[in-house]
């Protein structure tokens, strides 16, 4: 019985299946953790959702910002962008079933036995684990309710960017969503910066990657995250694992086997078209 953690799939179905074959993943015996952003950019978002849903209890995933955006498109709130390649999914006969399943997935996974925490973008250093759990449940409850379109319409925006327990209503939900699914950089006090996307060596002072600021969760747990492909899985402190290595951009799909901390990679079937800045089929 092994635990396999895989970075952002982004609709790269063929690479996902090849990677699972490579590690000899056995449903029903092994457990698969996925860092979110299952969909968008790659050609197989529909196939990815169908497959992951079929795995049932042997998969543990978290929602990413692209998954939430898909739900907003599905709800008629956001525009379906051609570059996301979501039309086959949105027009599939089982789209309602798949997307109603997706919106009931969590923002946070915790394994107390392994002392392991997973969230798409990471865990803000302003939170302890109980706060993170409570905040995740706040958003999950709204997403799984009939009023989820109202939340999806209000989730876009960069403010507020500083946590306080006194936050309420949509402002609270927006901060939580940004912290779990969009965060990269923080100010030294843990306040989120939602604008900078540079690599850490080029980030303007005084910004630091969220994982470079000590926090209660990172001091007691290992943290697995995705979201930040330009890190290429490098530069994180001990116990912090960034697994998004840009498969949809022509990079790799990366897997970490938890028990022995061994990495496996599956090269993308796509290459970067430097003229367009987009990955195309190889």
UniProtKB/Swiss-Prot annotation:
CDD domains the record matches: MPP_ApaH
Record GO terms (molecular function): bis(5'-nucleosyl)-tetraphosphatase (symmetrical) activity
Keyword rRNA-binding found: no
InterPro entries reported for this sequence: ApaH, Calcineurin-like_PHP_ApaH, Metallo-depent_PP-like
UniProt entry keywords in alphabetical sequence: Hydrolase
Similarity-based family: Belongs to the Ap4A hydrolase family.
HAMAP family: ApaH
UniProt protein name: Bis(5'-nucleosyl)-tetraphosphatase, symmetrical
Encoding gene (name): apaH
